[in-house]
Amino acid sequence: MSGPLSTLNAMNDAASDGESAEQYIASLPEDAQAWMREFTEYVAGHYPTVPYLMFRGRPMFKFEGTYLKGYVMFTAASKHFTAHAIDFDLIEESKPRFPRASFGKGSIKIPYADLDAKQPLREFVDAVMARHGVPRDR
């Protein structure tokens, strides 16, 4: 198997912190699994140079040795999917593109039913990566 899924599987094998990313994703409700797989595969497929690991039991793509230098992390709750980044200003600038979301200082919380938010969320991830000089691979 090749492509983003095989990349994620290889990274899962190397993930630390106990539970693998796949185990974490499999433990989520169905809606949460779908969002989590879609966005972890998006990042792994388009940004294969960014290390994928488990951080505090959640999937994270970390740019450098410390998360303080930049990351994209995803978490799932019962009714919403959350994207996290340390780029607080990008989150603030993105607010108008997510009318049904709620926000934290470093997070965008999107209800699973808000399928229209998926494309702006991909673009947010792309903006975070561009800011940190991460090349997009297709």
Residue ranges of predicted features:
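Charge-dense, helix-prone N-terminal extensions
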Residues: 1-138
